[in-house]
A protein has these predicted regions:
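Extracytoplasmic/periplasmic, Sec-exported soluble proteins
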Residues: 13, 17, 32, 36, ...
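Conserved C-terminal helix/tail region of periplasmic/extracytoplasmic solute-binding proteins
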Residues: 42, 158-200
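Mature extracytoplasmic/periplasmic domains
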Residues: 92-170
């Protein structure tokens, strides 16, 4: 059919694409130790599995935990691409106390608090202030990354942990997986996963 972008591929919910994904996942199944992300990171830290599909924040945790027991782990984004994810704070439309929720979000988005939260959970904050960038620079690292996509043009060559902040070139080969706005598409994918995992 010609070339498709990573975004088109990741958001293709056609019957044909879901069937192909199911076929490939079933072929891989004998080599899969588990499907749950938390299970994989635990197994990685113990040196019991060699590869895991995981979110970068979980990878940070696993790398740190594994290092404590002498297991060396790394985190890479496939050349073919991956998904871009981001976490943020939101207020549901049915919230009872919007004012309190707003205060909480404002508190969590203060750079000093965002940094403490990042250190506690391993995930990057949506806050992109100079204070966050300065705190994340690690001059002991050999590689420089272009983070201008996140922190602005002044961050085009900085020493940061690439697990938490991938280089701009890595981000270019990734895409956002959109939410399922069509319930039928969501149901098709859930049913496919059920068949792959053997739930039915």
């Amino acid at each position: 059919k010609g070339e498709v972008t990573v975004e088109q591929l990741m958001n293709d919910n056609s019957h044909e694409s879901i069937a192909k994904a199911e076929e490939q996942l079933k072929l891989m199944k004998p080599n899969i130790a588990g499907w749950e992300a938390d299970f994989g990171k635990e197994m990685m830290t113990k040196g019991k599995v060699w590869m895991n599909f995981t979110w970068s924040g979980d990878a940070v945790w696993a790398i740190e935990e594994a290092a404590e027991v002498g297991v060396e782990l790394d985190y890479v984004v496939p050349i073919e691409g991956s998904n871009v994810w981001f976490d943020g704070w939101v207020i549901p439309k049915y919230a009872r106390n919007v004012k309190a929720a707003s205060y909480f979000i404002n508190y969590m988005c203060r750079p000093d608090i965002a940094l403490r939260n990042m250190d506690a959970i391993g995930y990057v904050s949506a806050v992109a202030t100079p204070e966050i960038l300065e705190a994340k620079i690690d001059s002991t690292l050999e590689n420089y990354s272009d983070l201008s996509y996140f922190f602005g043009p002044e961050a085009d060559s900085v020493q940061v942990d690439p697990v938490q902040y991938p280089d701009k070139e890595v981000i270019k080969r990734c895409a956002v997986i959109r939410d399922f706005t069509n319930k039928e598409d969501l149901q098709k994918v859930l049913e496919m996963w059920s068949r792959v995992k053997g739930d039915n």
